[in-house]
């Protein structure tokens, strides 16, 4: 089984915010793959299905971003999913808005959701789909920025990035992740 986890914050007030691009991507995968997120356990909303011959788990932790590991670790244990089958989708301040970057492991890079996952999983060695949200301008606080919504000008770039992330997730079902990473990291 391959687990795709989108990071975000639960609740209407956080829908479509920069910090929730992981949730938005999981919602798109759910539609495209016809896997309803109709199960709830371990402080998460999730669904399972088969895509390209692979059993798939789609997850949206409902713990708030900074506690994502509290949902993901128990689900990984429950379904006996090895760390190399975990794919995490999240926002990244260090990438320009609309850009995606895949990587196989690394530090949290200041992202509290990733920090929680590393802490609870006991390892930073899991595949990541980073979606660029850019950096705040004009002295805006980071917390206000990530919890804000995309501007009208940013909407097309984010829609493209989410679509590219969906395509990368699909490719990761049938190709080695390093190959997928090389293919998608080249795209602008």
Swiss-Prot record:
InterPro entries recorded: Pept_tRNA_hydro (IPR001328), Pept_tRNA_hydro_CS (IPR018171), Pept_tRNA_hydro_sf (IPR036416)
Coiled coil: none
EC numbers for this chain: 3.1.1.29
Protein's job: Hydrolyzes ribosome-free peptidyl-tRNAs (with 1 or more amino acids incorporated), which drop off the ribosome during protein synthesis, or as a result of ribosome stalling. Catalyzes the release of premature peptidyl moieties from peptidyl-tRNA molecules trapped in stalled 50S ribosomal subunits, and thus maintains levels of free tRNAs and 50S ribosomes.
NCBIfam families given in the database record: pth
HAMAP family: Pept_tRNA_hydro_bact
Protein name in UniProt: Peptidyl-tRNA hydrolase
Organism: Bacillus pumilus (strain SAFR-032)
Gene expressing this chain: pth
């Amino acid at each position: 089984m391959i687990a795709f986890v989108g990071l975000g914050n639960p609740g209407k007030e956080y829908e479509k915010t920069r910090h929730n691009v992981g949730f938005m991507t999981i919602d798109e995968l759910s539609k495209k793959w016809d896997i309803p997120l109709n199960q709830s356990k371990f402080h998460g909303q999730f669904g399972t299905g088969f895509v390209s011959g692979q059993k798939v788990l789609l997850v949206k932790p409902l713990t708030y971003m900074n506690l994502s590991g509290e949902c993901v670790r128990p689900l990984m244990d429950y379904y006996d999913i090895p760390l190399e089958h975990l794919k995490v989708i999240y926002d990244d301040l260090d990438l320009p808005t609309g850009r995606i970057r895949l990587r196989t492991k690394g530090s949290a890079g200041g992202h509290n959701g990733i920090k929680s996952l590393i802490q609870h999983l006991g390892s930073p060695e899991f595949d990541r789909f980073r979606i660029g949200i850019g950096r705040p301008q004009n002295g805006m606080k980071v917390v206000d920025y990530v919890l804000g919504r995309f501007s009208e000008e940013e909407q097309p770039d984010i829609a493209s990035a989410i679509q590219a992330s969906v395509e990368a997730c699909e490719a990761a079902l049938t190709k080695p992740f390093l190959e997928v990473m090389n293919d998608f990291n080249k795209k602008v």
